[in-house]
C-alpha cells in the first residue's frame, strides 16, 4: 500500500466512483424524460397539423365566397373579361392553399421523432428542423388569415403548433 499523496488520490477515486456512477445514471434518466416530453409535444403538434389538414378543405369554400364578394365589389361597372377574372382567381386561390406547407410540416415532425428517438447528438439538426417547422407554421398562418371561422380555427391550431415548437426548443436547451 502506498503512503502519502498517492494513497490520498486513490482514496478520492474510490470514494468518488459510486457518486460519479449515480450522477451518470441520473443524467441518463433526465435525458430520457426530456426526450419523452419532446416527443409528447411533437405528437400534439402532429395532431394539430392533421386537424388543419382535415379542415383546410372547408377553407376553400370560405375563401371562394370571400373572394367572390370582394371581386364583385371591386368590379362593379368594370369591363374585365370573365376568363381573365377566372385566371386571376385561380392564381389567388392557389397562393392561399396550405396543403404543401402541411405536408412539409408533417415530414419535419416525423424527422424530429426519428431524431429524438435515435438519441445521441441532436444540436444543429434539431435547431434546423424546429426552424423549418416554425417557418411552415408561419406560412400556414399567413395564408389562412381572414377567411372566416375556418381561418380562425386554423389560426388557433397554428398557434398551438408554434407553442409546441417553442416548448420542444426549450426542452432541447436542457439536453447536452
Model-derived features: positions:
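N-terminal intrinsically disordered, cationic/polar leader segments
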Residues: 1-176
